[in-house]
């Protein structure tokens, strides 16, 4: 089973948790896109949901495939969000934001009664941090903000390169018009403390540490999909 097949397996298992009539947050990224494709097939057969996308990219795919969408302002309370993750640990703490949609992903997930994470087994880690931590910042004062992040990380015993994310045509900009810093801290022994400290930096809009947000994770491997709950 290759990587895409595992993503499809996780998405199939997640789809079993979606009930007709649900207000559904729809994530961003390659695994979430497999979920959207499967959801669209079900919608085409008469299944009723109202989706709230976490990015313009997801919105475009949903509209292309016929998945009905609403804005979060129209549906401010959601039943369930299904989204991918770049890393997930045994306490269901996540690193997200590899696709650049972390702010909207966190807003939508926080507006949901439950969040189910879908991923392949390569994303499961003992300690978060092998994946670069995305930190969304305001463009104004970006150098000062990066310096504040470096000092904060140092106080917590973390160090590593922090770079502005680029795209094919220059600096990457989020859907909200912000920059993303990718922080190569390595292992983050106290993700909870880092999340609190990053939240206190004025120029930080959001960060990719999702703490106490996910309700469960569906992890796909060569033998099929399994469910993780917080240990």
From Swiss-Prot:
Recorded catalytic activity of this chain's protein: aldehydo-D-ribose 5-phosphate = D-ribulose 5-phosphate
Residues that, per the record, bind substrate: 28-31, 83-86, 96-99, 123
Pfam families per the UniProt record, alphabetical: Rib_5-P_isom_A
EC number: 5.3.1.6
GO biological process, one term: pentose-phosphate shunt, non-oxidative branch
GO molecular function, one term: ribose-5-phosphate isomerase activity
Record-given protein name: Ribose-5-phosphate isomerase A
Gene source species: Rhizobium meliloti (strain 1021) (Ensifer meliloti)
Lineage: Bacteria, Pseudomonadati, Pseudomonadota, Alphaproteobacteria, Hyphomicrobiales
Gene from which this protein is expressed: rpiA
């Amino acid at each position: 089973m290759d990587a895409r097949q595992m993503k499809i397996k996780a998405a199939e298992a997640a789809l079993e948790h979606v009930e007709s009539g649900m207000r559904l947050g729809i994530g961003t990224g390659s695994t979430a896109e497999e979920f959207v494709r499967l959801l669209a097939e079900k919608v085409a057969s008469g299944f009723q949901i109202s989706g709230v996308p976490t990015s313009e990219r997801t919105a475009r795919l949903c509209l292309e495939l016929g998945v009905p969408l609403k804005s979060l302002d129209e549906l401010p309370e959601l039943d369930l969000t299904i989204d991918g993750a770049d890393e997930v640990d045994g306490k269901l703490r996540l690193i997200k934001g590899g696709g650049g949609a972390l702010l909207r992903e966190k807003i939508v997930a926080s507006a949901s009664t439950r969040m189910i994470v879908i991923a392949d087994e390569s994303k499961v880690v003992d300690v978060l941090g092998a994946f670069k931590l995305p930190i969304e910042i305001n463009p104004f004062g970006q150098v000062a903000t990066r310096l504040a992040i470096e000092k904060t990380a140092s106080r917590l015993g973390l160090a590593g390169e922090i770079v502005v994310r680029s795209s094919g045509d220059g600096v990457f900009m989020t859907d909200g018009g912000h920059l993303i810093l990718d922080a190569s801290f390595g292992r983050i022994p106290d993700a909870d403390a880092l999340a609190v400290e990053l939240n206190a930096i004025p120029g930080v809009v959001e960060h990719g540490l999702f703490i106490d947000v996910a309700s469960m994770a569906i992890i796909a491997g060569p033998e099929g999909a399994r469910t993780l709950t917080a240990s």
